[in-house]
């Protein structure tokens, strides 16, 4: 009994002094822990390198998030407005960061690679507007992609404020540094959506109409800013950015003037300037894109 008690005491003393069970090998144990830690780190690095963004190419500029939700099995028998988003992805319509033109593609941002692959699997044989869905994981590094998103967001914000702020900000450096979280991405997309709801792009407004003419002519719309972001004087073509104080006016503006002949747009004053304008007008149509559509 005494021998047994003595043996137990020796084991406890050894455990207390070394922190290891008697007979264990320290180097081997440390090596095992190091290997496990290295394995976990490697898995994390591989996960970070895997894509979390899907690219969908389409010439249709009017697709919305509900179109991509509708093809999930969980929503097949639900009405619009009742769709769920268990994979929790965010949709972005890809636009040129300088001129804001739609670039025939959409990005679906997922929280991780597993959610991305699950979406591909669930929608493999689906169709959007009778067109077979084919999505491609985006190989572009996420920081590079997010830098482009930041550039578009910043230029759009500046254009919404004023023409001066837009042109001054075109050459400003944009960089995504540090950890970029899902919440930050949501915040950027939400702010972009809010501005897009209140903004339109207009092709072919008569070149003689200056910004203050636009404000006077369309006095019954609550216009915030209006300026040309692209122009070709020789071809008498221009692209104008117009922002409104509310989304309703932006929607009404497109509905009322999209497709109108440029020469029909002007209601000239009684001062007799028709001859001056007639040389500048042609049969081109006013083309308007509401950025939220």
Curated annotation (Swiss-Prot):
One of its GO terms (molecular function) is pre-mRNA intronic binding. GO terms for biological process: Group I intron splicing; mitochondrial mRNA processing; positive regulation of mitochondrial translation. It comes from the Eukaryota. GO terms for cellular component: mitochondrial inner membrane; mitochondrial matrix; mitochondrion. Transmembrane segments: none annotated. It is found in: Mitochondrion inner membrane. Keywords: Activator, Membrane, Mitochondrion, Mitochondrion inner membrane, mRNA processing, RNA-binding, Translation regulation. Activator of specific mitochondrial mRNAs. PET54 is involved in the excision of intron aI5-beta from pre-mRNA for cytochrome c oxidase I (COX1) and plays a role in promoting the translation of COX3. Present with 799 molecules/cell in log phase SD medium. This is Protein PET54. It comes from Saccharomyces cerevisiae (strain ATCC 204508 / S288c) (Baker's yeast). The lineage of its organism: Eukaryota, Fungi, Dikarya, Ascomycota, Saccharomycotina.
